[in-house]
Amino acid sequence: MSLRSLLTGHRSKLLAVAAVVLVVVWMWVTGRLAPEAVAVWMERNGVVLRQALATGLLVGGVYGLVALGLTLIFGVLDIINFAHGALLTAAMYITFVLYTRFAVDPYVAILIAAPALFVIGAIIQRLVIHPARHAPTHNQLLLTLGLALFIENLLLVIFTGTPRSIRLPYGRGATDLGLATVDFPLRIAGTTITMSRLAAFLFALLLTGVLYLLLQRTDLGKSIRATAQDKEGARLVGIDIERINLITFGLGTACVGAAGALVLPFLAVDPTVGEAFNITAFVIVVLGGMGSVPGALLGGLIVGLTQELGVVFAPSSTKLLGVFVIFLLALMFRPQGLLGRRS
């Protein structure tokens, strides 16, 4: 390969690297990267920076759980589910009704919301996705997009467009956690960590770990992984592909069922709240690698940190700008994702 063809094939990557180098050089020349300037900035904004790091990690864990369902569905069924965010919204409304009508704690409601979304996902897969399995890719995308619009408008009819939220009777002041009594919100090195965000992060890590063990250690998980790698080969060794597709789609939607219950204590719900999660989840899946469970968690943490740190260095209205920059860099330099496999 000649030098000219090599440069031509990697022109976009070279331009991106050149742009980063120019920005760094400009900041150095203008004194913005001088040790004294950095020290002054840290003295003024150190607490804000630490708070952004803490919040980014906590939110990133939940993002990872949402993206996990999306990457699982794509890895096995080879379909991008644009209705993922709308299903998250449905899970939030289910949790809201359980809490306001039946006094079911949101963290207990996970045991109801996740199975309910599993059943809803299985029905969608059987009645909507399965008949279109041989359709062109763009038709499948339009199908899931139409499904998302249907779910959003159905929720709008039932609950109207008024944002709804809940306020837990605990989580502020001394809170008995069984093994110990903890005073919330936690204050560590100048950062504030609320109970609801910490609980969401820990539950997300736990559920991600459980799903990872399910995929790695059980016969069902081995069947799912075999189907993702080679459908025809899996069929030849006796695996029921249609059953695996149905279960996998159900597991993917169960992930957003759990995530919906986890975010409701600190996020108001309206019929379109899932759209932002949808966009973020797609970025995470591309960043972490299509079909990679650890990649979804890693991508979620990176995106969560990028969002929160972006607010420190730029106006809050540009919160997603840094996320899309990461998205473009991932597409240019590692299109298979951080932990994905090259096709």
What are these regions (language model features)?
Residues 131-132, 137-217, 244, 309, ...:
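Transmembrane helix-bundle core of multi-pass membrane transporters
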Residues 32-59, 193, 214-219, 245-287, ...:
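Inter-helical junctions in multi-pass inner-membrane proteins, predominant
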